[in-house]
Every structure is written in structure tokens, then in C-alpha cells.
From Swiss-Prot:
It catalyses: N(2)-formyl-N(1)-(5-phospho-beta-D-ribosyl)glycinamide + L-glutamine + ATP + H2O = 2-formamido-N(1)-(5-O-phospho-beta-D-ribosyl)acetamidine + L-glutamate + ADP + phosphate + H(+); L-glutamine + H2O = L-glutamate + NH4(+). HAMAP family: PurQ. Pathway: Purine metabolism; IMP biosynthesis via de novo pathway; 5-amino-1-(5-phospho-D-ribosyl)imidazole from N(2)-formyl-N(1)-(5-phospho-D-ribosyl)glycinamide: step 1/2. One of its GO terms (biological process) is 'de novo' IMP biosynthetic process. The gene is purQ. One of its GO terms (molecular function) is glutaminase activity. This is Phosphoribosylformylglycinamidine synthase subunit PurQ. Disulfide bonds: none annotated. Part of the phosphoribosylformylglycinamidine synthase complex involved in the purines biosynthetic pathway. Catalyzes the ATP-dependent conversion of formylglycinamide ribonucleotide (FGAR) and glutamine to yield formylglycinamidine ribonucleotide (FGAM) and glutamate. The FGAM synthase complex is composed of three subunits. PurQ produces an ammonia molecule by converting glutamine to glutamate. PurL transfers the ammonia molecule to FGAR to form FGAM in an ATP-dependent manner. The keyword Phosphoprotein does not apply.
Length: 257
């Protein structure tokens, strides 16, 4: 059986594509860089992949606001193809700036109800924190559900998840869209700096209603090996990133293999 093919979407300013590429490869997938210009020129097609990942960075220099230019370019050259990809049930994952991109594209929720905005601290937050899985998402359930807190690095200035009202937040929970929450070593907490940006309800990661479009602010690809972790986590057999990417490739192999 061929390894699952994972497209890594790029444009000028993305800068975490290499870490994502090698994380996918080390976990048994077949990664491929897909520049937005390759899609526009017809050299590569969204439909060729089993999963898509939009990596972190500062796409288009984050001019106007984080992720909006990359989102506009993707919608212009492959809007229908990406919608069809998502409707097929295949995973689309946005990490940090990639999360901002897919939020701008409206792939997780309505933009007038749900947004990523400036950190409460008013500055770029770059540190380690922890996340705890809070949904029953089948892609990551076996590795993360009910197994405590997992160390992850964050690095962003516009990572605060905000909702337009209590009804929107309630609907996210009803639809099981809250994938991970910020935590300390004891469990979910809203306290800074563990919640580095002030996200509502300490939410670190969201999905669409079907669970296959996934956005997260932490960077699992930056903690693939235990030696990249800090404190007691450096002595764990498997780091968070390996668990994350192993889960993705295992899911793809079972469902779309």
C-alpha cells in the first residue's frame, strides 16, 4: 500500500514547511510541497492529496492581517477544489499562520462569529505550554484523549480565539469542535502564560463540524522528538509532535489508504 500523500501548501512568507515535511515523512507519509503558484499554473492539483497542511510562518508578511492574503490567493486559484476536498472528508490542517488562513477562508466557522485576533498581552508570545484533548475527534483520539497534558511550543501574535457571543461558544461544544485546550501539567487552565493569548475558554484548537478541517495555534512539528521538549517531557518515549503526525498518517492509512 502506498503511503498517504500529504500536500503542504505554501506561498511567500511561510517558514515552517520543512519541519512539517519531515514530520510527515518520519511518520510514514509522503509529503509534497505545493506552492500556490503551482496550483494556479495547473502543475499540481488539490485532488491529488489524501490530506493538506497549511504550515506556520508569516504568509505575505502578515500584511493587512495574519493569513488574509494567503487565504485570498487560495480562494482565487482553488476555492472550489478546496471546498470539494473538505466535503470529501479528507483532512485539512492549518497550523498557527495556517490556522489563521483557514479561518479567513471560512472553513471552520463564519467570520462574523469566530475569529483569531491579537493576543491579550499585546505582544508576540513564544514559549512552551501544554494542551489537553477535549473532543472525540477520530484522527487524534487514540493518542491524546484522556491521557493528560502534552507539551507544545507556541509562537504567535494573533492567536486569541474570540467568539461573537455565548451561543457561538455553546454551538462549538455541541458540535464537538473544540479539539484541544491550553493546559498546565495538571490540566486545563485559563491562566497566563499557559493560555498564552487569552483565547476564550482556553481553546487552542478548533475543527469544522465534521472534524476534518483542523486549526491549531501550537506547533507540533517543532516538538517531534523528545529532546526538543523541556523538563520532564524530555524523558518521555514519544513527544507530542510524533504522536500528532503518527495519528494523522495512521488515520489516513486506515480510512483513505
Amino acid at each position: 500500500m502506498k503511503p498517504p500523500k500529504v500536500g503542504i501548501l505554501l506561498m511567500e512568507g511561510t517558514n515552517n514547511e520543512t519541519e512539517v515535511f519531515f514530520s510527515v515523512r518520519r511518520s510514514g507519509g509522503d509529503p509534497d510541497y505545493v506552492h500556490v503558484s503551482d496550483i494556479a499554473a495547473g502543475r499540481k492539483a488539490i485532488s491529488d492529496y489524501d490530506a493538506l497542511i497549511v504550515p506556520g510562518g508569516f504568509s505575505a508578511g502578515d500584511y493587512i492581517r495574519a493569513g488574509v492574503i494567503f487565504a485570498a490567493r487560495l480562494l482565487a486559484v482553488a476555492g472550489k477544489e478546496i471546498r470539494d476536498f473538505v466535503d470529501s472528508g479528507r483532512p485539512l490542517i492549518g497550523i498557527c499562520n495556517g490556522f489563521q488562513v483557514i479561518m479567513e477562508m471560512g472553513l471552520i466557522g463564519k467570520r462574523d462569529e469566530l475569529t483569531l485576533t491579537n493576543n491579550e498581552s499585546g505582544r508576540f508570545e513564544c514559549r512552551y505550554t501544554y494542551i489537553t484533548m477535549t473532543s472525540d475527534n477520530p484522527i487524534f483520539r487514540d493518542a491524546f484523549k484522556g491521557k493528560g497534558s502534552f507539551q507544545v511550543p507556541v509562537a504567535h501574535a494573533e492567536g486569541r480565539i474570540a467568539v461573537s457571543g455565548v451561543s457561538v461558544l455553546k454551538r462549538l461544544y455541541e458540535n464537538d469542535q473544540v479539539l484541544f485546550k491550553y493546559s498546565d501539567t495538571h490540566g486545563v487552565t485559563d491562566e497566563y502564560p499557559w493560555n498564552p493569548n487569552g483565547s476564550v475558554d482556553s481553546i487552542a484548537s478548533l475543527t469544522n463540524e465534521h472534524g476534518n478541517v483542523i486549526g491549531l495555534m501550537p506547533h507540533p512539528e517543532r516538538i517531534y522528538y523528545s529532546y526538543q521538549a523541556m523538563y520532564d517531557d524530555a524523558r518521555k518515549d514519544q513527544a507530542t509532535g510524533k504522536l500528532f503526525y503518527d495519528s494523522l498518517i495512521s488515520y489516513l492509512s486506515g480510512v483513505h489508504g
